[in-house]
Amino acid sequence: MKPTTIASLQKCKQDKKRFATITAYDYSFAKLFADEGLNVMLVGDSLGMTVQGHDSTLPVTVEDIAYHTAAVRRGAPNCLLLADLPFMAYATPEQAFENAATVMRAGANMVKIEGGEWLVETVKMLTERAVPVCGHLGLTPQSVNIFGGYKVQGRGDEAGDQLLSDALALEAAGAQLLVLECVPVELAKRITDALAIPVIGIGAGNVTDGQILVMHDAFGITGGHIPKFAKNFLAETGDIRAAVRQYMAEVESGVYPGEEHSFH
């Protein structure tokens, strides 16, 4: 199978073809996703909550991400694999480069970092040194203590304008993808339309170029709080492979996320 690349997603945006992505943390699920044609995966620091049982993503280390990245890469050798740089792993551009090198050596194609204009120099440094970058704006879980919880971001003109400004700054610095999390649909559309790079939404309506879900949310195995934007595809299909196929089909057709999964 031909490898999925950043250029593949760029073509999807140009052709207005929505695409699905998902988090993955181990060999078996990565292989299952790849076998079903779901070829863009993120080793997210969400593993701190879903795999390790912490109440936030903050305890996750670069070594944790590298370990899971290597496992996912073995299961899905041709996928486009993103890996999070966890909390305090990119406080300076130099630190970001060192830690990005670790996860790239483990098998990542691209690193994802959370934050806006303050990251411009870091993004420039990474991309100049052949480390592709995915930005992450809106509800950035590593900032949960600043936000005072997991809340919708970008409501109101000033907050929305700031997020758009952040997105444009990241793109200008060299970011090649952007994740938008928990923002109003109207703002997600503004940002998606303004950027040349593909935008992947989670809790941002069906107006972005792609969608991502934490796999545990997509299969209803989180336990506890279920985010408004999540949908349990396993409950509807009763089979994990069928659930993956339905998730992809609903994203590609624009059925998911629906109005009930969106914020305004």
UniProtKB/Swiss-Prot annotation:
Family, as annotated: Belongs to the PanB family.
Active-site residues, Swiss-Prot/TrEMBL: 181
Keyword Cell division: no
Keyword Cytoplasm: yes
Function as written in the Swiss-Prot or TrEMBL entry: Catalyzes the reversible reaction in which hydroxymethyl group from 5,10-methylenetetrahydrofolate is transferred onto alpha-ketoisovalerate to form ketopantoate.
Keywords: Cytoplasm, Magnesium, Metal-binding, Pantothenate biosynthesis, Transferase
Pathway: Cofactor biosynthesis; (R)-pantothenate biosynthesis; (R)-pantoate from 3-methyl-2-oxobutanoate: step 1/2
Source organism of this protein record: Escherichia coli O8 (strain IAI1)
EC number: 2.1.2.11
Gene3D superfamilies (alphabetical): Phosphoenolpyruvate-binding domains (3.20.20.60)
Subcellular location: Cytoplasm
Any one cellular-component term (Gene Ontology): cytoplasm
Binding site for 3-methyl-2-oxobutanoate: 45-46, 84, 112
Cofactor: Mg(2+)
Catalytic activity annotation: 3-methyl-2-oxobutanoate + (6R)-5,10-methylene-5,6,7,8-tetrahydrofolate + H2O = 2-dehydropantoate + (6S)-5,6,7,8-tetrahydrofolate
GO annotation terms (biological process): pantothenate biosynthetic process
Stated name of the protein: 3-methyl-2-oxobutanoate hydroxymethyltransferase
Example of a GO MF term: magnesium ion binding
InterPro entries given in the database record: Pantoate_hydroxy_MeTrfase, Pyrv/PenolPyrv_kinase-like_dom, Pyrv_kinase-like_dom_sf
Cofactor binding description: Binds 1 Mg(2+) ion per subunit.
Top-level taxonomic group: Bacteria
Residues where Mg(2+) binds: 45, 84, 114
Quaternary structure (record): Homodecamer; pentamer of dimers.
